[in-house]
From Swiss-Prot:
Function (record text): Cell wall formation. Catalyzes the transfer of a GlcNAc subunit on undecaprenyl-pyrophosphoryl-MurNAc-pentapeptide (lipid intermediate I) to form undecaprenyl-pyrophosphoryl-MurNAc-(pentapeptide)GlcNAc (lipid intermediate II).
UniProt name for this protein: UDP-N-acetylglucosamine--N-acetylmuramyl-(pentapeptide) pyrophosphoryl-undecaprenol N-acetylglucosamine transferase
Membrane topology of the entry: Peripheral membrane protein
GO molecular function: UDP-N-acetyl-D-glucosamine:N-acetylmuramoyl-L-alanyl-D-glutamyl-meso-2,6-diaminopimelyl-D-alanyl-D-alanine-diphosphoundecaprenol 4-beta-N-acetylglucosaminlytransferase activity; undecaprenyldiphospho-muramoylpentapeptide beta-N-acetylglucosaminyltransferase activity
Amino acid sequence: MSGKTRRLMVMAGGTGGHVFPGLAVAHHLKDQGWDVLWLGTADRMEADLVPKHGIDIEFIQISGLRGKGIKALLAAPVRIFKAIRQAKAIMRRYQPDVVLGMGGYVSGPGGIAAWMCGVPVVLHEQNGIAGLTNRWLAKIATTVLQAFPGAFPKAPVVGNPVREDVLALPIPEQRLTGREGPIRVLVVGGSQGARILNQAMPEIAARMGDKITLWHQTGKGAKESVQNAYDNSVKCEHKITEFIDDMAQAYAWADVVICRSGALTVSEVSAAGLPGIFVPFQHKDRQQYWNALPLEKVGAAKILEQPQFTVDAVIELLTQWQRPQLLEMAEKARSAAIVDATEQVSAALIDAAKK
């Protein structure tokens, strides 16, 4: 393969948890001279985000089946077959040396198409519980990687690729030693927000007063109502934003983060070296609970599932956690991070491309 520009196809879409780790790997291999093409869907976030990162993208037509009616389920085989055919056409035109499946609806047809075309398939499972698509694709994949132990019994644990600016933050000892004043609480609801955080945090802030200062990211469409709730009752310093464009800056500012426990969020909080209060989204397989559990086990975080996430419970934790303990927890979080995940995934792709 010497002298030939190697080609990677990244299959990922739908949510930031799939797309951002894929972008980290794509940029890493582009820096090593690889050519990268993204396979996505035209109506999800990757359609807008990936081109902004200077990466070409092509689309297939596929969507999820969960919650759809009987007609959609009956039509599913035809839709899936069509998506596989579209992916095969793109695959034959681009001729990748290897494909990387990061999850999302696009990975299923894309992975099958790659296998049918004889292209090595490397899968990366971001969550502590494997999704349905990756469980199926694991049977035909050349290599299977996992971010957290337990998703697959024998797959190497490589962590989640996270953004370079998060990895570049000063370690907790440098960042937090000598910091004084109210505890800085970062509340992150994700791009879609988290209603339970938006509802509870203004009351928590009102009762804690000047013991804390807050930066609360509400998610799309919730800023005005949350801002009003804070302004009507909260005396402490607070900043309310719909989105946070620079998460590294937010992590650097914070002493503790309160958030959902999506796979990428957990990995970023760990890499940044921050204590966390994780509020897993309630799902039948408890995926977000399993994502956060390793950090709770090492003493870097506390999991409060939704029935336990009460105003009193959060106030009790924030009152107990004084700065020496927060620093200790931050150091444990950073120690638990796998900071070379991008390099490990890239190495697996390079190896698979040689086979």
